[in-house]
């Protein structure tokens, strides 16, 4: 049955390891499945859609791994990915969405103190990488609209974390500042189950 969607997916490495996908009701002007750097394009982590009004980048940011073994790689990734997104934003307003694998502030993680600089996703290196997006003109639109709201988008499957709501907010919409006035609403839909992540949404008006 046709649902009138245009789809594109990207997965290069082992099945189940990484990958991104976008479904759209409108055919994009352009689809690109990499950032143009071999060292970062081996895991299918970025998908770019160019639309009439904005660019859309779907991302699955690398996890720094157990014992932070990939933290150096993650630091390099953050720099190169920001450069990529900044160049897109210079051409057209840009939305970046997906799993950023970082809890940006204490409000974004249920257990900040025991995880800080010990767990992947909550090191100062990763926090600084996210800060750089903000200092370069991108807005964490959920936190912009909900400065004090505690809501998470990911829970570890272990320790019944979902049932106890011991979670992390690591899934984001980062938008060019020029899109701020187009935002109607954004939400974290933690009422939905079926994954260790829950959906997030962004409503725009043009």
Regions found by a protein language model. Give the residues of each.
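Single conserved hydrophobic/aromatic residue that forms the stacking wall/gate
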Residues: 1-7, 12
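Short acidic (Asp/Glu) patches
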Residues: 8-9, 31-47, 73-82
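Conserved beta strand-loop-helix elements of the APE1-like EEP
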Residues: 16-31, 149, 160-181
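Active-site beta-strand termini and strand-to-loop segments that position acidic
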Residues: 25, 49-52, 176-177, 202-206
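Surface-exposed cleft-lining segments at the edges of enzyme active sites
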Residues: 36-37, 62-78, 114-118
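Beta-strand-turn-beta hairpins that frame and shape the catalytic cleft
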Residues: 44-60
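Metal-dependent phosphoesterases centered on the DNase I-like endonuclease/exonuclease/phosphatase
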Residues: 77-166, 170
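Surface polyanion/phosphate-binding segment centered on an Asp-His-Pro turn
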Residues: 187-206
């Amino acid at each position: 049955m046709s649902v009138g969607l245009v789809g594109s997916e990207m997965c290069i490495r082992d099945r189940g390891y990484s990958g991104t996908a976008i479904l759209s009701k409108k055919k994009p002007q352009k689809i690109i499945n990499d950032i143009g750097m071999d060292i970062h394009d081996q895991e299918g982590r970025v998908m770019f859609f160019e639309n009439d009004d904005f660019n859309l980048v779907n991302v699955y940011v690398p996890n720094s791994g157990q014992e932070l073994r990939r933290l150096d790689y993650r630091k390099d990734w953050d720099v190169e990915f920001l450069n990529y997104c900044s160049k897109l934003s210079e051409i057209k307003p840009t939305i970046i969405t997906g799993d950023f694998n970082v809890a940006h502030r204490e409000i974004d993680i249920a257990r900040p103190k025991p995880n800080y600089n010990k767990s992947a996703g909550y090191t100062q290196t990763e926090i600084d990488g996210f800060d750089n997006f903000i200092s370069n003109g991108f807005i964490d639109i959920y936190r912009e609209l909900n400065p004090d709201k505690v809501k998470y988008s990911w829970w570890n499957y272990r320790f019944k974390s979902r049932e106890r709501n011991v979670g992390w907010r690591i899934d984001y919409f980062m938008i060019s500042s020029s899109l701020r006035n187009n935002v109607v609403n954004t939400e974290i839909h933690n009422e939905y189950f079926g994954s260790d992540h829950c959906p997030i949404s962004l409503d725009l008006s043009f």
